[in-house]
């Protein structure tokens, strides 16, 4: 995704657990509760306006919605079985990655001392486990870099981009988003302000590009309008989300357009496909929403309460789970929630609503998530 800023920065995924596929995550950026203008600010920019830990106070839960009060309301609900391996979360405002099980227990975290290059800060907005299970790729749009983290050593071992410097030349990125590790060792990323999606190999060479650098018109497949989502698909294709024009484009492995549709949201973020091939996409706004749209552009479902505990504030990623529920990053309410489309209610939550923090059951602008497979261990 991409937003206004809260950290120094700029401007969100179905878990593809199939063999050879990438474990997708979402993540988008988040910042202050600002309605995206035209052109919309990046998510990183939005995040920059987010509240620091402990600075905000929350209101009471409303009838029919999950309580925001504490771990009991977020950790052991019946919805926990929808991600038996727990999930990876990019807790952007706290500058950390967490692996959390379905009971809310944190069983892995990054960074630890010495993990990040000297003089650099870490503020990942997305993170995805590589198919081989040995590394995690983290996207840090605030600092214009992509990091590969070695799980065994807990250190960054590879970085692409020039830290703190945006650009379009060789080795540069401009507001990168959703960096996904591929089975061949490459990484695919949406380079938002360069209006392109690129595939980068381990030698830091661009080996494939969708769109033309600097050409920011929504006219797929030739050009793309500020793409902020680039979800790899099991068939070798890619699902691209465009901020400009609120469009979602599905490309086949050979690059031809399968569909190119307008989605009924103000600021689309990190579109995913559900098991039926429909598009699930978050509206990075306040109040925000999540919609399901058919490949022909027909609205099938919307979740978007305008008030109360169910209201979303800049949701950046919505991932359809195996049981039909939807896992959502609710960035500026500092929580992850699961919504049941059958009842349009929150049935599970991690994070304390409107209360950012670092302690148990607290997050601070969580901007990315990835459901993990059962039995995973770092």
What spans do the regions from the language model cover?
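Generic cytosolic/nucleocytoplasmic N-terminal low-complexity/intrinsically disordered segments
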Residues: 1-2, 343
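Post-signal peptide N-terminal segment of mature Sec-exported envelope proteins
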Residues: 36-76
């Amino acid at each position: 995704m991409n937003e206004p800023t809260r950290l120094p920065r700029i401007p969100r995924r179905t878990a593809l657990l199939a063999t050879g596929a990438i474990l997708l995550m979402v993540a988008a950026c988040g910042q202050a509760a600002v309605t995206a203008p035209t052109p919309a600010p990046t998510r990183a920019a939005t995040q920059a306006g987010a509240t620091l830990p402990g600075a905000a106070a929350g209101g009471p839960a409303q009838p029919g919605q999950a309580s925001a009060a504490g771990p009991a309301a977020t950790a052991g609900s019946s919805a926990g079985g929808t991600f038996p391996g727990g999930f990876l979360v990019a807790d952007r405002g706290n500058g950390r990655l967490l692996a959390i099980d379905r009971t809310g227990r944190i069983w892995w975290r990054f960074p630890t001392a010495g993990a990040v290059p000297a003089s650099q800060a870490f503020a990942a907005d997305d993170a995805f486990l590589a198919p081989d299970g040995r590394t995690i790729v983290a996207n840090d749009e605030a600092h214009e870099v992509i990091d590969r983290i070695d799980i065994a050593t807990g250190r960054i071992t590879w970085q692409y981009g020039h830290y703190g410097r945006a650009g379009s030349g060789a080795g540069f990125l401009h507001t990168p988003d959703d960096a996904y590790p591929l089975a061949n060792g490459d990484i695919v990323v949406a380079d938002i302000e360069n209006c392109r999606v690129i595939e980068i190999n381990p030698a830091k060479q661009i080996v494939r590009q969708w769109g033309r650098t600097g050409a920011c018109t929504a006219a797929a497949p030739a050009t793309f309008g500020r793409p902020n989502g680039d979800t790899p698909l099991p068939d070798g294709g890619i699902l691209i989300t465009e901020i400009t024009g609120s469009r979602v484009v599905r490309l086949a492995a050979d690059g031809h357009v399968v569909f190119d549709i307008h989605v009924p949201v103000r600021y689309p973020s990190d579109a995913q496909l559900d098991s039926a091939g429909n598009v699930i996409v978050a509206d990075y706004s306040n109040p925000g929403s999540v919609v399901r749209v058919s490949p022909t552009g027909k609205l099938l479902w919307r979740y978007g309460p305008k008030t109360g505990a169910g209201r979303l504030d800049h949701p950046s990623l919505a991932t359809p789970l195996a049981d039909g529920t939807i896992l959502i990053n609710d960035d500026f309410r500092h929580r992850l929630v699961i919504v049941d489309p059958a009842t349009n209610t929150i049935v599970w939550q991690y994070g304390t609503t409107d209360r950012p923090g670092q302690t148990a059951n607290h997050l601070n602008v969580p901007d990315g998530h990835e459901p993990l497979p059962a039995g995973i261990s770092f």
